[in-house]
Amino acid sequence: FLDYAKKIGADFMATGHYADLVFKKEKTYLRRSIDLNKDQTYFLHEVSSNEFKYCLFPLANLTKPEVREIAKSIQLPNRNKKDSVGICFVGERNMKDFLNRFIDFEPGPIIDDSNNIIGEHHGSLLYTIGQRQGLRIGGVKDMPDLPWYVFKKDQKNNSLYVCQGEDNPLLFSKGLSLERLHWITDEFSGQLECEVQVRHRHKAVKCILDVNELEVRFDEEIRAITPGQSAVFYLDNICLGGGIIADQIN
């Protein structure tokens, strides 16, 4: 999109992301927006500083309630629309039905933490770590009447692993490993003390990032670390960059 904006002669590209930019010593840094509840820098961690210098974020210093008041004052047609929690450009729709148009899902076994098969899933890609809903696991013989949660997925064998209890230790990780790492502005090496955020609107926790080994160790355990999602790093509300989670470290 930025290439197109340049092609038509635009000097800048404005987006509706809740994010901010800081300019220091001819460098461009990505910073959290003033509305920390809506901050979207997590989604922008793979954009480079060379691209950010052409971006404008008009919502950087506005909260969502303030944006709504502006929309009402100028009578925008969507001024009373509820907040969206769907994926951008996909919208509010049944995700399973949407994905079924592009992916053939195969059922597979649901396995408990004692390696017993206790059910069948509709396709392991449809489930996420920490998920409770949709497992369709009834009463299991000789097991307590507690809810089941996904704690691991084996994509190669199309298997789903579950445990009982929201606070089961199997759901928590002491760290994670990364597939790759992208820096937005400054590059780092060795070990870096910073904060890591593992999903949108999730509390960032202090950590030590080993840049050379692509490993992260948390100061406190984090629940439901999910391979394939992003781990994004911050220092004093500046988004340093991030990477794709390869695996949990327990």
Task: Please report, for each region that a protein language model flagged, where it lies by residue.
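Nucleotide-activated chemistry modules centered on ATP-dependent adenylation/adenylyltransferase
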Residues: 2-239, 243-250
